[in-house]
Structure formats: C-alpha cells, structure tokens
C-alpha cells in the first residue's frame, strides 16, 4: 500500500491534473494539544479562489487527515496550522518522511506560537536537514502573482518581518513554512478578522502561488 501510494504521488500529481481532474487536499490533524483546527474557513476559501483564478479543480471541502493514517498518501498537498504544541510519534514522523520523499507536499503556517514545536518535531522527520530561508527571488513568489518582496505580512504581532522557509529533497521543495505572517488568517471569512480587502487578497494570491507551485513542480 505505502509503496503503491508513493508511486502514485510521484507520477500523477501535476498542475494539469489539478486543472483537469478532481483533486483533494487536506488539513493535518496532529497530537500535542495545539489547535490544528484553527482557521476553519481558510482552506475552503483558498480552494474557491484557486478554482476561480487558477482554473484548478480542487474539491471544495478539504479533508482532515492524521499522519498515522495511510490516507495521507491520497493527498498531494497537506496544510497544517495552529498556535501551540505539536507532537509526532515515531511512526508518524516516518510516515511523513515517506510521504514527502514520495512526492507529497506540506505547507505549515505558523499561526503565532507554533514555531518552536514545529521545528522540534521536524527534526524527528528529517534529522539531517535544515529549513532554508527563501529569498524573494524564489519561484514560489513569482507564479501567477508576483511578490517582489517575498512573503506578505498579513497580521502584526511583535513587529518581526515575515519569513518563508523551505525543506528540500535534492532540488525539490517538499515543505513550505510561513512564519510571522499569519497567511491562513487572511484566507478566513471576511468577518472573522475584519481584514481590509487588500490584505485578504494578498493572502489569497500568495496561497494561490503556493498551490500553483506545488502542482507545477
């Protein structure tokens, strides 16, 4: 099952398939007490934006998946967020590594308070690798929408600049980590944070770039 799933991930998922076939993406449910369920309207709104503006054909309702489940191999893109603790068991860390090595992609959005726990747990997954900060010239910022200054700042907490990090296997980015940005907050329904339309649109455009980059690799 796992070997077959890895082959499927490696071969089938592309931007053209995201446009021409129904594709499902998922929200990661993790252990540790952190609020993995934060921003419940984020992914549905991003999906709607991408289907409208990128002409993707992503199922309107994201699935929820746990790392312990073989179902993770059914999703080319998994999103994780939250404000607090994350814990990966040894088997979950191994499953995530297999998923990423096999062609899957994980986007982690720090919703303020996730950073130290996420970095700790990723060392269980890839002890030999480091997150690499991405410059504004990276292609993920220059897909359908151009962000010449890199990751946009959506919500202000402590005056720090937003940062984007990638984790790479060979030359392929398999994980995109958005920090000090609150990107997913900008995808939420308008009345959740009452963000200006310009701010919300920036967040959705950056999210669309992530989707286009993932399916275009």
Which residues does each predicted region cover?
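Bacterial N-terminal signal peptides
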Residues: 5-14
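Aromatic-Pro/Gly-enriched surface loop or interdomain linker
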Residues: 18-77, 81-84, 182-183, 187-217
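An acidic, glycine-rich "communication" segment
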Residues: 21-24, 29-33, 41-45, 115-191, ...
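Short alpha-beta junction capping motif
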Residues: 25, 77-116
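Surface-exposed patches in mature extracellular/periplasmic domains of secreted proteins
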Residues: 57-65, 108-111, 129-137
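Alpha-helical scaffolding within the catalytic cores
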Residues: 60-67, 84, 89-94, 159-163
């Amino acid at each position: 099952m796992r070997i077959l799933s890895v082959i499927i991930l490696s071969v089938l998922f592309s931007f053209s398939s995201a446009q021409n076939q129904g594709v499902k993406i998922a929200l990661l449910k993790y252990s540790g007490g952190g609020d993995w369920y934060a921003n419940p309207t984020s992914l549905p709104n991003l999906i709607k934006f991408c289907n409208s503006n990128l002409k993707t054909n992503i199922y309107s309702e994201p699935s929820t998946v746990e790392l312990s489940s073989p179902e993770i191999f059914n999703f080319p893109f998994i999103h994780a967020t939250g404000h607090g603790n994350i814990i990966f068991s040894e088997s979950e860390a191994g499953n995530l590594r297999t998923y990423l090595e096999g062609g899957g992609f994980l986007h982690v959005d720090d919703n303020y308070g996730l950073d130290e726990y996420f970095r700790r747990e990723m060392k269980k997954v890839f002890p030999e690798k480091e997150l690499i900060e991405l410059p504004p010239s990276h292609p993920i910022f220059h897909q359908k929408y151009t962000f010449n200054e890199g990751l946009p700042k959506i919500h202000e907490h402590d005056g720090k600049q937003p940062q984007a990090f990638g984790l790479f296997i060979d030359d392929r980015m398999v994980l995109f980590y958005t920090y000090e940005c609150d990107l997913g907050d900008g995808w939420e329904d308008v009345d959740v944070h009452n963000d200006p339309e310009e701010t919300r649109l920036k967040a959705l455009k950056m999210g669309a770039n992530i989707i286009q980059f993932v399916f275009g690799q």
